[in-house]
C-alpha cells in the first residue's frame, strides 16, 4: 500500500522485475478511478504550491491529465502540454529524443508546440509527469525546457518510484533536490517469503 499525505492509502499492484528478485508498485494513472486521480492531483498541487509556479508543463502521455488537474487546482487558466506527435508547424529545434522505462527502445521525440513558447519562456515552470522511475522521461522534459533557457522551479509526479531516478535527475535538474516532489513514494521491493518488503 502507498500512503497519501492526508493518510488515505492506495493499494497498488506489485510487478516483479524479471530475473532480479525485486519488484515495484505499479501506477497506471489512466486506469485509476476518478477519485484516485483527483486525490493524487490534490496532493501534488499541495506539494507544488509553495514553489509558486506560473505555469504547469505536462509530459505525455499519462502526465498530461495529471498536469492539467494540478494546474486547475493551482488556480491556473491553462497548462503547457508537451507532445510526441509532430504537427507540421512544429520546430525540430523545440524537440528532444524521448524514451522511458516502459518504452526504452522507442525512437520518439518530445515536442513543445511553438505557439506555447510564450507561456513557458521566462516563467516559473513546474514540470509534471505521472511517475518518475528511471528519470529518463522527466530528464527529456528538463532537456527540452533547457533548450529555451528555462530551469523549472519544481518537478512533480504522482509517484516517485524507488530511488533509481536520483542520479539522472542530479545531472539533468539544476534545482535543489527538495524541488522534486511526489504525491507519494514507492520503494524498491524484495521478496520476503510469500510477500514483499522494502529492499
Where do the model's predicted regions map?
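Active-site-facing substrate-recognition patch
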Residues: 1-52
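Short glycine-rich phosphate-binding loop at a beta-alpha junction
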Residues: 53-60
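Structural motif
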Residues: 55, 124-126, 154
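Gly/Ser/Thr-rich loops at beta-strand to alpha-helix junctions
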Residues: 60-66, 134
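Short Gly/Thr/Asp-enriched flexible loops that form oxyanion-binding sites at enzyme active sites
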Residues: 65-74
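Short, glycine/charge-rich flexible loops or terminal/linker lids adjacent to PRPP-binding catalytic cores
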Residues: 75-125, 194-198
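Acidic, divalent-metal-coordinating active-site segment for phosphoryl/phosphodiester hydrolysis
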Residues: 129-138
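PRPP-dependent phosphoribosyltransferase catalytic core
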Residues: 139-199
